[in-house]
Amino acid sequence: MDCMYDAELVDVVKNTSNESILPILEQKINLLVSSGETKCYRTLKRILYDFVTRKHLDGIMYILDSELLTDNVIRKIDRYCILLSCKFGFVELLEYLDEIGVDILVEKIYLELIFEDSFKYSRYDHDDEYYDDHFFKSSIHYAVKYGHMNIIEYLSCKKTNADGLLSACSLKNIQLVKYFLDQQNYDDNTIYHGLRSACWNGDLEMVKYFMQYIPEDKRNNVFILDHVCEEGYFDILVYLIEQKWKIDVEFAIKQTVMGGRLEMLKYLIAQYPDSKYSVVKLIETISYCGKDETLEYLLSFEDSKLKKFIKSNKFSKLLEVVCERGYLKVFKILFHLNENVDLREAFSNACQNGHLDIVQYIISNKKEFTDKNFLENDQEHITYLTRITFAKGHLDILKCLDEIGISRSYISEYAASLVIGNGFRSKKTLECVQWLFEDEKYHKYSQAIAVKAFRYDTVSVIKYLVSVGLDIKPITNIALDYICINNNMDCLKYLIENGTDITINDNRAIKLAAQEDNIDIVKCLVENGADIRTDDDYVMKICTLRNHKVLIRYLMSLDIKEPSNESIESIEPINTIKNPNKSEKNWIKHHCESIYYTKLMDRP
């Protein structure tokens, strides 16, 4: 297999002195160019990196001045040299680039051009294939990032560069901020952006330095305060108010409440006693954020609308969200405002999101959940509650429900299988299955649960199911399909260890794994007896058709030749359907991780 750069040349250059290197380059450059743009560029990247680290400007100039390189390679190398000069403070290189007409103030240098000093590259590396603007930064950004003042000064003398100032702000470098502000003039918009960045970083010294550049009549950008209030930068808030910064008091109070900043809230209310704000809306906001101390403080204010609010549907909805997020202290405070509120949905939210403390508190304080009328007359709600809680894997809550008479009898086969893939947050997937199977009548759910376990590579559950009597043979087809589609190596190894025939259905497994570009699965199957050349080299043909480069290289290492274009025209990809084994369709349910109410309630 060919490496994507000339490793031999890179090593020679690396181990040759500056005095002896130019003759080698002169001798090798023609051959390198003839190898193609990609290999040429990737090789030169590594050579240039080495030259810059040892400040060998003559070697770099020889490459940059070469008339043999294509325009595309030259363009990439130019920008790469800009980045390296910024990274290593090689101002002589930057000056030379400027001298030969390269735009050194470029706004987009591909970020992935940076690579490790160790030169450890995968032979399958693809370091130039993605060009999303999200990964681009400017030359001045890198100059600021690496902090070489000679580079920063050289770039700054070319033009007023707002990106340099803002980069210094984001990197919290007050010395560079002072340098840029003292050396250059910026428009109001740039100054506002810099001040806001300083506020977001909580840097009071930087805020003070920016303030001297903002006239008092222009201190009116209300959005400067949003992060200050939410993050609790009290000293900056006080300073801005002292500097007569115009603020939207209602907005500032809301942001302070969202951050749970009690002392700042008290300060704002004291500073602006005549300001108007809705206590009810603030209570809703602070409850959503789970800040109990701030909530208690807000409730100390009288509000004529509060009594009406706690009897409304909005209050019930608020409790539902609080229970969903698990804010026990907030829930207790709100519950005592109206203990007659309907908590069924709130209770359900607490159960399915695993908040045992809230579940126990509701059971202790709302007797209706232990009342016979609830257990006998609200079967639909109880059924959903039990199934969704099991599907999410909250075993401690299931046991708590069992104590008040809500047993595992409500759990369907479909709900039982959902715990695989949905119970990962609780980390008790296996324990939930074991708890359910304490009653042997639920062993009939084994195959449905096992199918999901093969899909999500949950081999611990499969081993347990086998230990209590599961026969894997009826589901081998669908198990292998999921393994090959989802790259589930643990489950594949388990099947092989237990003597499963991995060549069934005309070696479908290896063909499907190749089609899905799962090289590790392909290798494992080959090592354990699968026929890599089955069906007239189907594996190589499907890899060629779908351009699976890594797999193609692996197959070529096994002396399998690439097929002709004519031979792959008629190749038919394997259809991956919801249930790969149609004969088992009646009792195996295929579904995604989403849990839908109708399916959860209707499916057996």
UniProtKB/Swiss-Prot annotation:
Species in which this protein is naturally found = Acanthamoeba polyphaga mimivirus (APMV)
Which keywords does the record carry? ANK repeat, Repeat
Keyword hit for Repeat: yes
| ANK repeat start-end pairs | 77-106, 135-164, 166-189, 190-219, 221-247, 248-277, 314-341, 342-371, 380-410, 445-474, 475-504, 505-534, 535-565
Lineage runs: Viruses, Varidnaviria, Bamfordvirae, Nucleocytoviricota, Megaviricetes
Under the heading SUPFAM superfamilies, the entry gives: Ankyrin repeat
- Asked whether the UniProt record includes Lipid biosynthesis among its keywords, one would answer no
Write down what this protein is called: Putative ankyrin repeat protein L56
